[in-house]
């Protein structure tokens, strides 16, 4: 089997990097500027209403994870009645998606992103990812790309992977590479 010389010139490497990593420039070290997703936090005031809302939200998440979607949605609503919080809307959107109620989920994600402030980067990141997935499902790739770019800038690895998947140049390059490797076999 012939061996291919896979040494790339710096220019070729930069072209491939710009295709496969659209948010990173190989000539710049942007990785240090983008936080890791695990470092993202939500900071909220420590009021009684928010504490009670958070407790209901956690119970709703547990119900949702166990498949009790209707009960979870009721608890999310009770949580929102105590305090309008972006995190609750984001998590309720996830449950609505599981219940195949995508339009309602999209409404909640829009509201979550309106409510989220600069101290709620985790919720913002997750809401952008979820909304990007919904837009992608609806074939609105431009809106999906915008949400994935916002989430990637906040540190989401998932969003960066989605950007590569919806990048037409990356798809074309993958196809060409697949053909080249098939010819080498």
From Swiss-Prot:
PANTHER family, A to Z: CDNA SEQUENCE BC021608, TETRATRICOPEPTIDE REPEAT PROTEIN 36
Protein keywords: Repeat, TPR repeat
Pfam families on file: TPR_10, TPR_8
TPR repeat residue intervals: 53-86, 88-119, 125-158
Domain of life where this protein originates: Eukaryota
Alphabetical GO biological process terms: tyrosine metabolic process
Stated family: Belongs to the TTC36 family.
The protein's name in its UniProt record: Tetratricopeptide repeat protein 36 homolog
Entry keyword annotation includes Repeat: yes
UniProt cross-references to InterPro entries, sorted A to Z: TPR-like_helical_dom_sf, TPR_rpt, TTC36
């Amino acid at each position: 089997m012939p061996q291919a010389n896979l040494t790339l010139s710096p220019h070729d490497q930069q072209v491939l990097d710009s295709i496969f990593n659209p948010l990173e420039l190989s000539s710049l070290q942007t990785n240090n500027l983008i936080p890791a997703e695990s470092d993202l936090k939500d900071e909220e005031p420590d009021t009684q209403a928010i504490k009670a809302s958070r407790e209901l939200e956690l119970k709703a998440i547990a119900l949702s994870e166990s498949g009790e979607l209707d009960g979870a949605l009721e608890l999310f609503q009770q949580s929102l009645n105590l305090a309008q919080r972006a995190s609750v809307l984001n998590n309720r959107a996830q449950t609505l998606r599981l219940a195949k109620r995508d339009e309602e989920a999209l409404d909640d994600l829009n509201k979550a992103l309106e409510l989220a402030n600069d101290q709620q980067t985790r919720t913002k990141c997750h809401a952008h990812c979820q909304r990007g997935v919904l837009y992608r499902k609806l074939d609105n790739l431009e809106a999906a790309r915008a949400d994935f770019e916002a989430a990637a800038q906040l540190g989401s690895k998932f969003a960066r992977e989605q950007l590569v998947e919806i990048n037409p140049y990356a798809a074309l390059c993958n196809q060409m590479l697949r053909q080249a490797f098939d010819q080498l076999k």
